[in-house]
Amino acid sequence: MKASIYDFTLDELSQLLKPSFRAKQLYLWLYAKYKTSFKDMQNNFSKDFIAYLEQEFTLRTIEIAHVRESVDGSKKYLFKSLRDNHTFEAVLLKMKDKKIDEETNAVLEGEKYTVCVSCQIGCQVGCSFCFTQKGGFVRDLKASEIIQQALLIKEANNLPIEKALNIVFMGMGEPLNNLDEVCKAVEIFNTGMQISPKRITISTSGVADKIPILAGKNLGVQLAISLHAVDDKTRSSLMPLNKKYNIECVLNEVRKWPLEQRKRVMFEYLLIKDLNDSLDCAKKLLKLLNGIKSKVNLILFNPHEGSKFERPSLESARMFADFLNAKGLLCTIRESKALDIEAACGQLREKKLQQKI
């Protein structure tokens, strides 16, 4: 089976292709011009070189099988692998963006886009609040399959080449359980799609022994920790992984995470009615994160089929956030996007193409 050209970093292609400058030319065609056929690159390459590329590599290995659009402008994409027909999902989040014109001080309104990518088909972690785990674990995604999610979404929405995307590894799967492919994808996002690592967030459920490995890669990405509870009993009931990597174990590794000035580790905290949304929980969270440059992102539980949990009131979420902010711990409430199309946090899973989606 031919390798996908999207699986190669710029350095790898530079070593593989002769002369080496061909790699940069090829990257331009792939990531700046969205070319999906080697024959479309004839302006730069000889017929012999194109024949070599066609013999050794393939291009697209996934395709968009279905799209659902939310009333808020967000879109959920169902992708199908062209190799094994398995499916996985990614989400395009559309948000308003305001910038200050440095010359006139005028407020400029625009739009910013975030692509929530998947790194696995299914997930092994088994969080009880997450819909992804109901489908079981199928396989890891290759770097090429991760990259193509953002590439195809950008192309489908006619976003200008120069339009920067934010990338969040918060779709299906645990990024640290597919670390090599995730790290390669980050490098290609940067050198290929020109997405700064500062715009890329890797979210983990807390695979503590792999956090220092990720740190050692020096990728410059943002780290997010899915915490969701303030004591081990509650967290273990929500996230079985906590029995292996408890809260103290995870936080010990987070304290070693290299942070640039003015940067913080993000802690994601899923608020579930009458389970972890009390003011007492907020007080314990404040104590847990003492000494860590952190930001708390509160997420109101997003209901899904078969779930036993309930979504808390916005009022209780605001009380939780107000307490933390008043004590000096930066806390925001994540606006739940795409709830109407089941594309919010914890609602993604593999779907069979023949079922209603």
UniProtKB/Swiss-Prot annotation:
So what does this thing catalyse? adenosine(2503) in 23S rRNA + 2 reduced [2Fe-2S]-[ferredoxin] + 2 S-adenosyl-L-methionine = 2-methyladenosine(2503) in 23S rRNA + 5'-deoxyadenosine + L-methionine + 2 oxidized [2Fe-2S]-[ferredoxin] + S-adenosyl-L-homocysteine; adenosine(37) in tRNA + 2 reduced [2Fe-2S]-[ferredoxin] + 2 S-adenosyl-L-methionine = 2-methyladenosine(37) in tRNA + 5'-deoxyadenosine + L-methionine + 2 oxidized [2Fe-2S]-[ferredoxin] + S-adenosyl-L-homocysteine
The region annotated as signal peptide is: none
User: Taxonomy-wise, where does this protein's organism fall, top ranks first?
Assistant: Bacteria, Pseudomonadati, Campylobacterota, Epsilonproteobacteria, Campylobacterales
- GO CC: one term? cytoplasm
Explain the purpose of this protein: Specifically methylates position 2 of adenine 2503 in 23S rRNA and position 2 of adenine 37 in tRNAs. m2A2503 modification seems to play a crucial role in the proofreading step occurring at the peptidyl transferase center and thus would serve to optimize ribosomal fidelity.
MF term (GO), any: metal ion binding
* Organism expressing this protein natively: Helicobacter pylori (strain J99 / ATCC 700824)
Protein's name according to its UniProt entry: Dual-specificity RNA methyltransferase RlmN
Q: Radical SAM core domain: from which residue to which, for each copy?
A: 109-340
Major enzyme class: transferase
What are the alphabetically sorted keywords of the record?
Answer: 4Fe-4S, Cytoplasm, Disulfide bond, Iron, Iron-sulfur, Metal-binding, Methyltransferase, rRNA processing, S-adenosyl-L-methionine, Transferase, tRNA processing
Similarity comment text for this entry: Belongs to the radical SAM superfamily. RlmN family.
User: Which domain of life does the UniProt lineage start with?
Assistant: Bacteria
Which residues of the sequence carry a binding annotation for S-adenosyl-L-methionine? Answer: 173-174, 203, 226-228, 302
